[in-house]
Amino acid sequence: MLRFLNAGESHGPALTAIIEGYPSNVKITTDRINKELARRQKGYGRGGRMKIEKDTVEILSGVRFGITLGSPITLVVRNKDWENWTDIMAIEGDSTNKRQILEPRPGHADLTGGIKYGFYDLRNILERASARETTTRVAVGALCKILLEDIGIKIGSYVLSIGEKKIDKSEIESISYEDRFNNAENSELRLPILGKDEEFKEYIDKAKEDGESLGGIFEVYALNVPVGLGSYSQWDTRLDGKIAQAIMSIQAIKGVEIGEGFNLAYLPGSQAHDEIFYSKERGFYRKTNRAGGLEGGMTNGEPIIVRAAMKPIPTLMRHKSLQSVNVITKEPFDAAKERSDITAVPAAAVVAESMLAFVLAREILEKFGSDNWIQIKERIEKYRQDVLNY
């Protein structure tokens, strides 16, 4: 089974991921992974850290002469900011009082993590809880995208809202997914409509002046996914559940919906479901996609559509702070302040692409085998033909 573990602290020496179950005979380049890492770092409203880090990956195992071996793949991304934190984040030696965090930030892992793991210096919590961890998720996601793209599956994302500033749904319904993606790639905020950046940037600038941070909503999709990934047979084999968990695991994500999601609760049954049609050329298909490509916990051949809501980042600017309590003195105190973003919704959308890619790649390998990619592709092609002939 395809799986990965990652490790590393936000200001430690490096971030590492080990991927197990990745098939052999897949062509891999660091350039492809680095391209995805660069996409994660883009976005108007990001903090000063993005000016320091220019993430690039090192492959330490599992690849020889650009071809995967079927053995575990080890990826490393060095933290360039580590040189400024060597004393504070030293592996060995005596502890230091420098840059201690004693006032937990509401909305972050600080306080609960400190209680759970027995630390008063909450830096021991926030360093791992930080969204910097998603760097390796994107690197792993790049490997998964390589598999998916080789069998015609395309994954993308775009931002629908930041704070109260929204893209009207009617504005994008007539635009193809390809154009939405291309527009998002050329937007500093991953907006699917051209010409909207400036008004959104002005809104973000105002939030910065007010010392605020902003959340938002993004949409991630997958096209040309085969019918029948996932299963209705057990609660934990339903693919919509796996996708929702993967997206919810991204820092600051507080809500996920698939297809029309919560809107379906307001519709009568006659308007909520996607009617079924058939043609010899297309096989079975739908004219609508309210289900978001998933029925009964399985893919139905339509595009997978997932939306996620990201809360505002808990770290506020220095001239505005939330009320907290010092964990040592128990006295009221302003919450700790760290260098942070005003908004990271565009970056979260890219991370969500990677998580969706991982879940789909894992399902593909579970259904069609996971040893040799050359053989796996042959099975997938035959299966697609069987589906068309059904």
UniProtKB/Swiss-Prot annotation:
Reduced FMN (FMNH(2)). Its cofactor is FMNH2. GO terms for cellular component: cytosol. FMN binds at residues 128-130, 251-252, 296, 311-315, 339. Pathway: Metabolic intermediate biosynthesis; chorismate biosynthesis; chorismate from D-erythrose 4-phosphate and phosphoenolpyruvate: step 7/7. Homotetramer. This is Chorismate synthase. It comes from Sulfurihydrogenibium sp. (strain YO3AOP1).
